[in-house]
């Protein structure tokens, strides 16, 4: 559900535009920002060439009000949505920034690429695109003609499956980009620790449920395969009637992680423990919904991480994109009310 974008620097080129045309382009840039901040990332070259070119176009905007508002859009995207990747400048007869732009298109087949404005006349993006034999599935759009496409993408904010949903499609369409373009991933599933009376009373030993062991093994391996540098935080949600066995719960997950690390030596997994509490009038209640929260977007998932059955067949599920403001609120609540587990 996370969409990778490539932005040609000349979408920020206001040269020669009348006031009404400037306002129209600014509106399109705002709509684009809304889409990216809701469910996307902007891929840029690690050398910073594209970013510098955008800076140059914005610096040349003659209208100070338009310039300020455009810079606000760019600054917001740079702060929250930029992801650097290594690119190789193409040796083609086109503008230098176009060579970096199309390099991104070649490297990332499912990228959503936005080009030009009416002043992009020296080189026609459509012609360049067709001459480069880039895969047809690449999305290439003119900045002034993306209203309809933006709305289509924004409308599709959830996926519900009650039938057989191919596992590979699920990974590619929903999880892959979330994992690939994020630095951190927080997984909150308050059903992962079962509320079993005999365990809570220490009459029987606590253990991780078998379905969660299956899913943790599978998804940690998949995450490591896609992005071995991704730092994963798994929340351990301890209810009021489980406080007595908190250490037992913590130790069981630490032991489980050690077993996982034998299969996945480079596993980047840490635990954060969150306890329900009503002490001194401070009521901490763990959220009912389950989440995958990255530094880019957040997904609400009714299954949590318990997505597969014992045969690795995908269960029915309902996954929704979380509003960016709600994402910040949820992430802050979980962080404030949890502590990092000391595994020593």
For each of these PLM feature ranges, what is it?
Residues 184-186, 297:
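Structural motif
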Residues 178-184:
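Secondary-structure "cap/kink" motif recognition
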Residues 1-167, 172-175, 197-344:
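PLD/PLD-like phosphodiesterase catalytic module centered on the HKD motif
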Residues 10, 190-191:
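Metal-dependent nucleic-acid phosphoesterase active-site entry motif
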Residues 191-192, 196-197:
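N-terminal, charged amphipathic alpha-helical interaction modules
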């Amino acid at each position: 559900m996370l969409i990778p974008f490539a932005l040609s620097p000349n979408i920020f080129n206001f040269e020669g535009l009348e006031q009404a045309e400037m306002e129209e382009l600014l509106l399109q840039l705002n709509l684009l920002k809304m889409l990216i901040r809701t469910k996307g990332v902007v891929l840029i070259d690690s050398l910073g060439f594209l970013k510098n070119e955008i800076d140059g176009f914005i610096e040349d905007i003659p209208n100070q009000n338009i310039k300020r508002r455009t810079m606000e859009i760019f600054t917001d995207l740079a702060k929250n949505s930029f992801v650097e990747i290594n690119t190789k400048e193409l040796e083609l007869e086109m503008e230098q920034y176009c060579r970096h732009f199309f390099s991104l298109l070649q490297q990332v087949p499912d990228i959503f690429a936005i080009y030009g404005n009416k002043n992009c006349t020296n080189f026609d993006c459509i012609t360049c695109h067709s001459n480069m034999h880039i895969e047809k599935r690449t999305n290439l759009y003119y900045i002034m003609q993306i209203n309809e496409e933006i709305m289509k993408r924004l409308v599709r904010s959830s996926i519900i499956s009650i039938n057989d949903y191919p596992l590979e499609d699920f990974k590619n369409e929903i999880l892959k980009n979330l994992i690939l373009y994020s630095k951190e991933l927080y997984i909150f599933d308050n059903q992962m620790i079962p509320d079993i009376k005999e365990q809570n009373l220490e009459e029987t030993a606590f253990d991780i449920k078998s379905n969660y062991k299956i899913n943790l093994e599978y998804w940690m391996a998949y995450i490591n395969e896609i992005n071995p540098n991704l730092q994963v935080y798994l929340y351990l949600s301890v209810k009021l009637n489980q406080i007595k066995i908190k250490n037992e719960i913590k130790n069981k997950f630490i032991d489980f992680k050690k077993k996982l690390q034998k299969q996945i030596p480079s596993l980047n997994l840490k635990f954060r423990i969150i306890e329900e509490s009503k002490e001194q009038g401070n009521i901490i209640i763990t959220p009912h919904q389950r989440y995958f929260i990255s530094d880019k977007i957040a997904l609400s998932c009714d299954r949590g991480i318990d997505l597969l059955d014992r045969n690795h067949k995908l269960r029915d599920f309902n996954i929704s994109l979380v509003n960016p403001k709600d994402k910040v609120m949820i992430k802050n609540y979980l962080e404030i009310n949890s502590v990092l587990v000391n595994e020593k």
